[in-house]
């Protein structure tokens, strides 16, 4: 996997466009207080399992994959607006 995106403010959804080939994503999220984090597609369907906590991998058990032409979003939902959250997203290939 290679780094695809660094997100300084992960409390806003981060868009990941799959342009050339089927792609799988994983992210590490770190927050100042517990958050919920997941990948979702254009239909708002969750791709992979959700993270609940202050830090960890999203999805926790393996990558979220998308087909060429699809768009995924990393969504980090804070419990309160004052939470600081950051993320790094990796992709393969």
Which ranges hold each PLM region?
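A general sequence property marking short-to-moderate contiguous segments
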Residues: 1-4
